[in-house]
């Protein structure tokens, strides 16, 4: 039987290639009309917008076995990345294994396999697969917070933002502190009548270049030699010396240390603030009509709120019993292997301090080696103990903001490589849990 791969974005394509390399037959399903996932502007679950660029540098983002062109800029735009993913699929012969315009609606355990129900242009079918890889990402179900009051103004989640024309000539309030919020508020500052940014808590604003090189390459160089606490102190000192504290720009100072949340990268935000084109506000207290009252008592009349407030982690095609307390709390060995459902694996169900592509490539190799019988998991009790230890360490570093999903980019890549080597030795020695035994 084949393996079913759900999603043909970066995670699904990396998985499909790894399975192909290991000689494991697979079929990939995606609701879009081309591969590339969220990087395809206008795709069914895409949150891409016209001004979107990478927020991690080219050399830290590319797949290890398929480098991006050396003459590309440090931070390519969405068009280049979507094309890169399409070329990746063509180069490695993956396109024929992808069923586009096909949506997975249900995945159910069936004996030692899995029944996968898929809706496509010709109707709905159910087929049995040996294993399932969930690789469809987790940025498709918008989260919009609720506030007291009765708003009459227009509201838009960043998931549905496409072009600065949506903001032109309007009084715009952007809510959130992530990368999308910074991109959109800068876009608004060039075309809107007035532009405000609301932040409930402080974030570390990192320029895309420091000391003449992409900023994430500096931390990457340190990661090979220093623990994260030491890197944190060095990075915070460097930012304070080169950029200054956020409060210098009227922004709230973060209460968390650097490297204890995903960094927010922006070259334009601080400049637009200091030029008076973006006003900074604290969190929202309530919204009445078109008036937004802030937690400091200030009131602003607004035409449009753009909610850059993240996403709910939602996997509606899976039995809730398989997700325990929720997809964002699900313990997974190495953030890949389900502890209680052999053959159910996840690629990309994580939040990294760096780029996603190298992480999902490493996870895909673990999945493929396991399903090919060349990688053995440790014993079940060892897996559970490791998950508990990883969660405790994550809570110590990241608190309660989805600690189960958090990973350190450089540390995880090193750990995944070590895990693959150790699991290969376990399989060769007849130890551990192989795919045939687990199934």
Predicted feature locations:
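Short, mixed-charge aromatic SLiMs
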Residues: 385-398
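Active-site segment of extracytoplasmic enzymes that catalyze sulfate/phosphate-ester chemistry
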Residues: 60-61
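Flavin (primarily FAD) cofactor-binding/catalytic cores of flavoenzymes
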Residues: 1-54, 67-204, 208-209, 220-228, ...
């Amino acid at each position: 039987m084949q393996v079913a791969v759900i999603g043909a974005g970066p995670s699904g394509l990396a998985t499909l290639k790894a399975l192909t390399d290991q000689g494991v037959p697979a079929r990939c399903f995606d609701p879009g009309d081309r591969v590339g996932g969220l990087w395809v502007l206008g795709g069914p679950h895409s949150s891409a917008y016209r001004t979107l660029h990478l927020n991690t540098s080219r050399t830290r983002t590319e797949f290890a076995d398929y480098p991006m062109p050396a003459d590309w800029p440090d931070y390519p735009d969405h068009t280049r990345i979507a094309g890169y993913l399409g070329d990746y699929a063509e180069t490695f012969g993956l396109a024929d294994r992808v069923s586009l315009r096909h949506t997975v609606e249900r995945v159910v355990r069936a004996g030692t396999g899995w029944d996968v129900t898929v809706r496509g242009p010709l109707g709905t079918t159910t087929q049995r697969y040996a294993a399932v890889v969930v690789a469809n990402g987790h940025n498709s179900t918008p989260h919009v917070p609720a506030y007291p009051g009765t708003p009459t103004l227009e509201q838009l989640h960043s998931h549905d933002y496409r072009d600065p024309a949506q903001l032109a000539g309007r009084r715009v309030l952007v809510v959130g502190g992530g990368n999308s919020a910074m991109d959109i508020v800068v876009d608004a500052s060039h075309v809107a009548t007035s532009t405000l940014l609301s932040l409930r808590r402080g974030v570390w604003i990192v320029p895309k270049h420091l000391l003449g090189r992409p900023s994430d390459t500096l931390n990457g160089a340190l990661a090979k030699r220093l623990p994260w606490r030491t890197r944190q102190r060095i990075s915070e000192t460097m930012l304070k010396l080169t950029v200054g504290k956020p409060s210098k720009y009227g922004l709230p100072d973060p209460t968390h240390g650097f490297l204890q949340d995903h960094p927010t990268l922006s070259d334009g935000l601080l400049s637009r603030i200091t030029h008076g084109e973006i006003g900074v506000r604290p969190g929202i207290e309530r919204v009445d009509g078109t008036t937004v009252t802030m937690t400091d008592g200030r009131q602003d009349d607004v035409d449009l709120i753009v909610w850059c407030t993240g996403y709910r982690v939602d996997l509606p095609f899976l039995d809730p019993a398989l997700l325990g307390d929720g997809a964002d709390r699900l313990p997974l060995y190495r953030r890949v292997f389900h502890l209680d459902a052999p053959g159910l694996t996840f690629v990309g169900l994580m939040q990294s301090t760096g780029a996603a592509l190298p992480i999902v490539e490493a996870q895909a190799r673990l999945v493929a080696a396991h399903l090919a019988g060349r990688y053995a998991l440790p014993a079940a009790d060892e897996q559970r103990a490791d998950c508990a230890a990883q969660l405790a360490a994550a809570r110590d570093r990241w608190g309660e903001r989805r600690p189960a999903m958090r990973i350190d980019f450089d540390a995880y890549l090193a750990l995944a490589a070590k895990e693959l080597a150790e699991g290969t030795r376990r399989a060769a020695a007849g130890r551990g849990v192989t795919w045939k035994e687990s199934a």
